[in-house]
Amino acid sequence: MVGWSILGILLIVVATLLLARFVFNKQVEAYLCNSLKNEMVEKLKDAGKYVPDTTSYNFAYQKDSVQSQKIREYFKLDTVVYSTMPTWDKAISLARFVAENIPHANQKINPKRRNAVDLWKYTRSIEPAFNCRLHSILLHELLLSEGIVNRFVTCHPADSEDSDCHVVNLVWLPELQKWAMLDSDMNAWAEDEKGTPLSLAEMRERYIDGREIVYRPLLNSENDFVY
């Protein structure tokens, strides 16, 4: 009887695992992701808000018109963006162009040259995909070539023992006088409830305060959205 009881328990465990893996896979994944999200949000709340920045700097962005023209011609960006488009629409179009052509992967061979043209050539001759940092560098240069001020930012956790990170672009929107996060690697951007694009700092504040963040997918496929 004991043997049959153990066998019965094992069968139940196996059946449960199979159901979790093949039948309720999405539900289990959603539950685990939500649990992890709640845990991370609690850590953000414990960390508190950013200390007000009292330091200011005067600096100018260096412009390389020759390189910008080279990039625009190489990528035929006149077919991707138009001069009459608002800054944010241009930025989304460029991010969508990158996301459609280069998926995410942790490359096995690191490219020797990290500029827009050489990164593109890398995906056509060595590996077809690469990580978030290289995504951000490529998008950074495409945006700059169209006169769009932007930065690529490495997001680190506060935990010194956690080596994970993610790299995204911050785009300056002169029409709105604000920064906005754009992520061609994970194929998304973030908005508030009114449709205004959010910066990284604004996203952090909203997580802490419990306010809504609406994530928008860059591509049209249901499977491209991984936030």
Regions found by a protein language model. Give the residues of each.
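Ser/Thr/Pro/Gly-rich low-complexity linker/stalk segments immediately outside membranes or between
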Residues: 22-42
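Secondary-structure boundary elements
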Residues: 35-131
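Alpha-helical and coiled-coil interaction segments, frequently adjacent to or embedded
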Residues: 203-227
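Residue-level marker of positions within ordered structural domains that often coincide
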Residues: 20, 99, 103, 174
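Hydrophobic/aromatic-rich core segments of domains that either
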Residues: 137-210
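Intrinsically disordered, low-complexity, compositionally biased regions/tails
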Residues: 7, 12, 199, 214-216
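N-terminal Sec-pathway targeting helices
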Residues: 1-22
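Long, hydrophobic/aromatic-enriched structural stretches that serve as scaffold segments
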Residues: 97-104, 134-138, 142, 146
